[in-house]
């Protein structure tokens, strides 16, 4: 980000997040119990989950104190691109829990011996409390007349996305476009690649996180369309748009799961397993599910989702694993060095 934009962009990000400061490796030792009986947890999470956990953590702390005779607990947050966050934990960031936006990030921690292989069985819904989908945020009046994925390949269009090489948000964007291309072209992979390559050639900025992409589009006023998660698009339009932005729902889009897990090795070393498990379990509570819906995340609780149908309209989505294989297969084929994404990305972008 150029220096002349840095101050305003940071102010915007702080305002939109309105959350406790992100904590990096300097706070890695904070996720533990201490001799006074106080418990401290560190939740390492993806970029645009800031708003959820800013409001969820106080709800959980209040409930925890009720259940534990007023016992003290604090929860600290670390946010960034999902895969970067997973790598940080794999390389030593002492997270008690991880709350990511794709299963491969937690599977990485399984391979590192930090999380149990059956982590999806530890919580309901395969450990996915919320889902989202990929939508388009456009400027007032939709001047480029973007109505569906196909329109993103138009000439003279500038797109802003998170970088698919390092972020879950960006990967869902790529897979959403590819899934649309396969459906629109009767599973003709060659035609799909032509479409995706043209769409990627229109990308003006590949940001290093979903929130950074939002800042670039909304605050720096770069681009005609931002491709991002439904919750991020809605919060941006509602909180900072002042009528200047509109959300476009494609007819068919990719479903984003937000899996969670206890980092078993860390929790056991610190004696925080019980608190960490209670913390994640509370994501399925009615108050937490309602909170997620109000923040435009699609809750696992079907009754809560139905009650918010006006804000979270029904739409046709696909699970990327049903089309592209397991996350290991997806990462290897599409996002490894020299993979399909690299093959289709215009050099110099």
Show where each model-derived region lies.
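Ligand-binding pocket segment of bilobal, Venus flytrap-like solute-binding proteins
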Residues: 184-251
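A bilobed periplasmic-binding-protein/Venus flytrap-type ligand-binding module shared by bacterial periplasmic
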Residues: 133-142, 257-274, 291-295
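Bacterial N-terminal signal peptides that target proteins for export
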Residues: 1-7
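N-terminal segment of the mature folded domain
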Residues: 31-167, 309-310, 316, 341, ...
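C-terminal motif of bacterial Sec signal peptides marking the signal peptidase cleavage site
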Residues: 17-18
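Short helix-loop capping/hinge motifs at secondary-structure junctions, enriched
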Residues: 141-147, 166, 179-187, 266-273
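Short beta-strand->loop
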Residues: 44-46, 138-140, 158-185, 200-203, ...
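Extracellular/periplasmic juxtamembrane helices and adjacent flexible linkers that interface
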Residues: 267-349
